[in-house]
Amino acid sequence: ATREVKDDIAETLRLQDPEIVITGFDRPNLYYRVETTRRKDAFVADYVRSHPGESGIIYCATRKNVDKLQELLTEYGFAATKYHAGLSAEARRKNQNDFIYDTAPVIVATNAFGMGIDKSNVRFVLHYNMPQSMENYYQEAGRAGRDGLPSQCVLLFSAQDVIINKFLLDKKDFAEMDDEEADLLRQRDLQRLQTMERYCQTTECLRNYILAYFGEHPTAPCGNCGSCNNDFDEVDMTDAAKWMINCVAELHGRYGKAILFGTLQGANRARLR
């Protein structure tokens, strides 16, 4: 937990000068990776296909995505089940047991799944959507590799994830709080979301990024994450760069960034015609 969370726990439990024992946040057997893609369904299907028989959790932000992705994997012939709060208690219990006992090695779920689940041989955790906070991501990704064997934690990122999460944050109910307290919590949630967005976009060591967030400061890159191993898509941007430079030159410095960006994006607005 971060210092803020530890302080909240102590305050809630009314602890006076508690002794705090921290075991460390590093999980060396976990390989962290961010994949920026709009073709998430295809990526997930290819990933599961390339890891036959392995146990994995795929987290989605919404029940709708859980239902859609589980149905897609089933159509492709994968033994995949699902879990979210919209299912009956009986269905949740059955699907959870199918996953635990490897009847269905893959489970697609919202963050309602995982608390109290003790399954050591989870080889991968995929996040179909970016979580709202590093705390959530660390906890959910950490369900991989509890047996100490190498396991992968892959986060699929697109700009749409930020929009979805902001929408979900806007729906949070602060009715029982006064306006000042509610505003503080909204700002906190937004800052946490921005931290996750930076994680998805950084080229720095992903493990060190996570550890630094939780107050640890490694002195060297881990050598075992997507950033350290250069798991990036290389795209030749030469033509695009020339196009942008020509566009700037054609505008002769007479217009601001809004007009420039609109022109580059091909926006159909009156001022650009």
Residue ranges and their predicted role:
Residues T195-P218:
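Structured, non-catalytic alpha/beta "coupling" segments that mediate domain-domain communication
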Residues V154-L156, D183-R186, M196-Y199, D233-V235:
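A short, ordered amphipathic alpha-helix with a cationic face
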Residues I22, V122, T202, D236, ...:
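Short, surface-exposed helix-loop/turn micro-motifs enriched in polar/charged residues
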Residues I163-I164, A175-E181, R188-L190, L206-N208, ...:
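Accessory DNA-binding and partner-docking regions appended to nucleic-acid-acting proteins
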Residues F43, T195, W243-N246:
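Pre-recognition alpha-helix immediately N-terminal to the DNA-recognition helix
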